[in-house]
């Protein structure tokens, strides 16, 4: 099965198995940031190795925040949020790298960086 299809099906199954809004909004933000940073790190593995190490540390910090704030039984919802955010961030990064339209590529790169920067700022504050 294609990797993208596996991810889509996982999101679909996890989303159907959990109630929306089942957790704290801050926990959701942590999970979304974990997904974004994970996609960013994977992109950096291919194109900017040294930056991936810094992103891995940031991801580790966010995962620690998730573990500290996640109530028992909310793991599926948290994973669904992470996967959704990772897929979205990965899409932006792919557009930034491979779009034939330069304006689209620039816009996608700026948006991907802005979203990752929001997560980094949350860790530092």
Label the model's feature ranges.
Residues 9-14:
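Hydrophobic helical h-region of N-terminal Sec-dependent signal peptides
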Residues 24-79:
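Short N-proximal segments of mature Sec-exported proteins
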Residues 57-125:
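Compact alpha-helical subdomains of small soluble proteins
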Residues 15, 38-39, 124:
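Charged, amphipathic alpha-helical interaction segments
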Residues 17-20:
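N-terminal signal peptide c-region/cleavage motif recognized by signal peptidases
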Residues 22-26, 47, 104-107, 111:
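Non-transmembrane, amphipathic alpha-helical segments
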Residues 1-8:
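Bacterial N-terminal signal peptides that target proteins for export
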């Amino acid at each position: 099965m294609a990797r993208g299809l596996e991810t889509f099906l996982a999101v679909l199954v996890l989303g159907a198995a959990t109630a929306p809004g089942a957790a704290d909004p801050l926990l959701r933000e942590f999970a979304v940031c974990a997904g974004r940073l994970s996609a960013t790190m994977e992109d950096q593995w291919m194109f900017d190795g040294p930056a991936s190490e810094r992103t891995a540390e940031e991801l580790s910090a966010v995962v620690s925040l998730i573990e500290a704030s996640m109530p028992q039984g909310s793991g599926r919802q948290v994973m669904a949020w992470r996967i959704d955010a990772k897929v979205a961030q990965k899409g932006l990064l792919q557009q930034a790298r491979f779009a034939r339209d330069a304006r689209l590529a620039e816009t996608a790169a700026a948006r991907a960086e802005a979203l990752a920067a929001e997560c980094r700022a949350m860790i530092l504050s």
